[in-house]
UniProtKB/Swiss-Prot annotation:
Topology in membrane: Multi-pass membrane protein
Induction remark: Shows a dramatic induction in normal epithelial cells contact inhibition.
Positions of the record's site feature: Critical for the pH sensitivity: 63
Protein name: Zinc transporter ZIP2
UniProt GO cellular component terms: cytoplasmic ribonucleoprotein granule; cytoplasmic vesicle; plasma membrane
Tissue: Expressed only in prostate and uterine epithelial cells.
Annotated residues for binding of Zn(2+): 175, 179, 202, 276
Family that this chain belongs to: Belongs to the ZIP transporter (TC 2.A.5) family.
GO molecular function: metal ion transmembrane transporter activity; zinc ion transmembrane transporter activity
Topological region Cytoplasmic: 30-46, 125-164, 211-224, 280-288
Bridged cysteine pairs (disulfide): none
Free-text activity regulation comment from the record: Activity is increased at acidic pH (6.5). Inhibited in the presence of high extracellular K(+).
Length: 309
């Protein structure tokens, strides 16, 4: 028991150190600032951004969405079994079967997607004056020739970037808490180490991508560091909670509530991935095949890690 506790505490500090190191690297080194980059340097940063976009895409589909769907289905099955009497089993078995076949997980993830869509639309409706955007972003996104040459259609307004960055941080924070919670609840040393290594493998790349995203959005260094620090604390927080509640009772809908929150977080993450990250990285027309290769490489790496996650 003491060995298991020591391993989990080691995982806690490893998660904290890796997240801080990977997240702060793009913020602390000026080489990653795309605004001042020119020529080959700028293209390399663009391709790194495409790799991070592929990592986000893989994390959204292969980890967050997959885990949310599995957990929601499992918790709904438990919830329905616990709240069904013997008489109801005999009289409404067909109805229960129909309820079990309904895609609850997909619905919850979609609700998370539309919830953020609504919040963003509401913010833009209430603050129409914010549509101006920053000078740097206007230079990067402006220029009618980009819209004419590129086939991806109209790009999102640059003023939405900070809001979507906030949504990205919140969704990743939720997911990080649940990842840490899962590590903290593991019953054996082998299971704890295996899950922690899987989390470390994909979390490092994801947080590095978050750091790059904050830098490219022109976030001040102070707020960027503060954001990474908060994100870094989420997995250790979840792990600490897992240690505190090990052996506790998961009845009373607590597991279902956790699964629903994870589904909503997955939906918000997909929203930001498809409407902010991918369009921004694919906006400029240079090296389209190289960009595709980088996005595919990032996704493939996350799909490979999903074998052990």
């Amino acid at each position: 028991m003491e060995q298991l506790l020591g391993i989990k505490l080691g995982c806690l500090f490893a998660l904290l150190a890796l997240t801080l190191g990977c997240g702060l690297t793009p913020i602390c080194f000026k080489w990653f600032q795309i605004d001042a980059a020119r020529g080959h340097h700028r293209l390399v940063l663009r391709l790194l951004g495409c790799i991070s976009a592929g990592v986000f895409l893989g994390a959204g589909f292969m980890h967050m969405t997959a885990e949310a769907l599995e957990e929601i289905e499992s918790q709904i099955q438990k919830f329905m079994v616990q709240n069904r009497s013997a008489s109801e089993r005999n009289s409404s078995g067909d109805a229960d079967s129909a309820h079990m076949e309904y895609p609850y997980g997909e619905l919850i993830i979609s609700l998370g997607f539309f919830f953020v869509f609504f919040l963003e639309s509401l913010a833009l409706q209430c603050c129409p004056g914010a549509a101006g955007g920053s000078t740097v972003q206007d230079e990067e996104w402006g220029g009618a020739h980009i819209f004419e040459l590129h086939s991806h259609g109209h790009l999102p307004s640059p003023s939405k970037g900070p809001l979507r960055a906030l949504v990205l941080l919140l969704s990743l924070s939720f997911h990080s808490v649940f990842e840490g919670l899962a590590v903290g609840l593991q019953p054996t040393v082998a299971a704890t180490v295996q899950l922690c290594l899987a989390v470390l493998a994909h979390k490092g790349l994801v947080v590095f991508g978050v750091g790059m995203r904050l830098v490219h959005l022109g976030t001040s260094s102070r707020w960027a560091v503060f954001s990474i620090l908060l994100l870094a604390l989420m997995s250790p927080l979840g792990l600490a909670v897992g240690l505190a509640v090990t052996g506790g009772d998961s009845e009373g809908g607590r597991g279902l509530a956790q699964a629903v929150l994870e589904g909503v977080a997955a939906g918000t993450f997909l929203y930001v991935t498809f409407l902010e990250i991918l369009p921004r990285e694919l906006a400029s027309p240079e090296a389209p095949l190289a960009k595709w290769s980088c996005v595919a490489a990032g996704f493939a790496f996350m799909a490979f890690i999903a074998l052990w996650a």
